[in-house]
Regions:
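His/Asp/Glu-rich mid-to-C-terminal helical/loop segments that flank catalytic regions of hydrolases
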Residues: 157, 223-240, 269-272, 317-324, ...
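Zn-dependent metallopeptidase/amidohydrolase metal-coordination segment
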Residues: 7-11, 342-355, 363, 418-478
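Active-site-adjacent substrate-binding region
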Residues: 232-248, 393, 401-444
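Acidic/His- and Gly-rich active-site-bordering loop/insert found
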Residues: 2-103
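Midchain, well-structured core segments that form catalytic/ion-binding scaffolds
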Residues: 102-105, 145, 152-365
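A short beta-alpha structural unit
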Residues: 16-20, 264, 298-309, 348, ...
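Active-site metal-coordination/substrate-binding segment of hydrolases
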Residues: 64-146, 151-162, 202, 313-316, ...
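Acidic, glycine-rich active-site loops and adjacent beta-strand->loop/helix elements
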Residues: 76-78, 139-147, 169-172, 211, ...
Length: 486
């Protein structure tokens, strides 16, 4: 199979086009310009707002003008992650895609099908006048991945739809009718620099090979967190030897499970062989723990040039204890929807910043607002007890399921008619923009669906090609069956 043969042709054509347009979160200027130019080229009413959101309207097919207006919605930004051995500048370089069996993936980077496939689907609908539909508005939002900025900034009256179809879900055959709310927290330690004693052995300890993945949608899989695993080894080493912590770094994004982490430490020269033995023992234990969930986990130890400075011992101890105690993973399962994670937390990243600051970023999610606040307070308490300062982002609301939704009934009937099986009705343990849309447009009737994606937010991200055709056929059938306005 070659890329030119992929079906539906229009969707894959536009997906390949937007893969040529850099679109990191908070740096979406190029894709915004691309969308506005697209709307103007096709002589469609196009507008933007101050946040960067773009709305393109397409009139109804003749004879369908009295149907309810449908908003098709996707976010334009993508998570920018790459493997360490890959040279790629997400601000300038296109995403290079390749076919692997029935899957489309990128070469060593995130693919950006989250949510580029939704954007491409909307463009294919806007460009094709043979498709039957009532009035359609295509909403493209910015910065979903790092702050839901576009959804937060959306003003009342910017769009006028009665129904919203969010195209940002990742399992074909599933219709989502609810999502978790979330909040981000930042803990900061201030440290003093101290001298590393002369003659100490300096080395880099690294954790790599983990799958990573989405901190909401994949949190129930029991995947390894590089920050937690590295900290386990550092904690035992700190207790056993006269260890100086010179550098620590792990994870990148608040909404991704940390795949890689490393630390540079210094210990007495006489202990270096024992340290290597310790790491071999620890690595064997950890690899056994994650043999099923994360079988490619690796630990490495490499000699480093001597470091003159390190983090003071008191701060190092408090940091390592806090990272050990900080919760990560599933905290509670839903009592209403079997198999749905209700509340979770992600120990996302550990970074050294200018001004002798160590910053730890975490994110908490829950479909229950009070539980979201509870888990966030738990995280705050752990870090404050260790002497860190803690701050929170604004957070965002969840989307409470409405099992009696009219558009849900239409979509479910359509799926059964087309494919002979029932679609699965679900809620998702991840933040969708839908909860914020309801704040501004409380009468919106919404569902979320999409083709099958795996490994999103990691370089392993891939899209199951046959599900794109099913998603497309389903979407077009839904548009045909939108009811008349009341």
């Amino acid at each position: 199979m070659e890329k030119k043969d992929l079906k539906p042709a229009g969707v894959f054509h536009y997906f390949e086009e937007i893969c040529q347009v850099p679109r990191p979160s908070k740096k979406e200027e190029k894709i915004i310009a691309f969308l506005k130019a697209f709307g103007e080229k096709h002589k469609l009413e196009t507008k933007g707002d101050e946040a960067g959101n773009v709305l393109i309207k397409k009139p109804a097919t003749p004879g369908m003008e009295n149907r309810k207006t449908v908003v098709l919605q996707s976010h334009v930004d993508m998570v920018c992650e790459k493997n360490n051995d890959v040279k790629h500048d997400f601000l300038t370089d296109p995403i290079e895609t390749e076919i692997d069996g029935e899957w489309l993936k990128a070469k060593g980077t995130t693919l950006g099908a989250d949510n580029g496939i939704g954007v491409a689907t909307e463009l294919a609908i806007l460009a094709d006048d043979s498709i039957e539909h009532g009035p359609v508005e295509c909403l493209f939002t910015v910065d979903e991945e790092t702050g839901l900025t576009g959804a937060f900034a959306l003003q009342e009256g910017f769009m006028s739809g009665d129904i919203l179809l969010n195209l940002d879900s990742e399992d074909e055959g599933e219709l989502f009718i609810g999502c978790a709310g979330g909040i981000d927290s930042v803990a900061e330690f201030t440290y003093k620099e101290v001298d590393v004693p002369a003659g100490y052995f300096c080395c880099k300890v690294q954790v790599k090979g983990l799958k990573g993945g989405h901190s909401g949608g994949d949190i129930h899989l029991g995947l390894g967190n590089a920050n937690k695993l590295l900290n386990r080894f550092l904690s035992q080493t700190f207790k056993k030897y006269d260890m100086y912590l010179c550098e620590i770094d792990g994870g990148n994004l608040r909404n991704a499970i940390a795949r890689e982490a490393h630390a540079v430490i210094a210990i007495p020269e006489a202990d270096k062989h024992a340290l290597r033995t310790d790491l071999n023992v620890f690595a064997a234990q950890a690899e056994a723990e994650y043999a099923v969930a994360d079988p490619d986990l690796q630990f490495t130890l490499e000699s480093e040039n001597p470091r003159a400075k390190a983090i003071d011992k008191d701060t190092s101890k408090r940091l390592l204890q806090a990272l050990y105690a900080a919760p990560h993973g599933v905290y509670a399962m839903s009592q209403d929807i079997p198999g749905l994670v209700e509340t979770s937390t992600n120990l996302a990243s550990v970074k050294m910043k200018p001004g002798n600051i160590i910053r730890i970023e975490t994110s908490q999610r829950s479909s229950i607002e009070s539980s979201k606040q509870d888990i966030a307070t738990m995280v705050r308490t752990v870090f404050e007890m260790a002497g860190a300062s803690v701050s929170f982002g604004d957070g965002y609301p969840g989307w409470k399921p409405n099992p009696h939704s009219e558009i849900l009934e239409i979509a479910a009937e359509s799926y059964k008619r087309l494919f002979g099986v029932d679609a699965k009705i679900k809620a998702i343990h991840a933040g969708l923009e839908c909860g914020l849309f309801l704040d501004k447009y409380p009468s919106l009737d919404m569902i979320s669906f999409g083709p099958t994606l795996q490994g999103v937010h990691s370089p392993d991200e891939r899209m199951l090609i046959p599900t794109v055709q099913k998603f497309w056929d389903h979407l077009l059938d839904i548009l045909k069956h939108i009811p008349a306005k009341n």
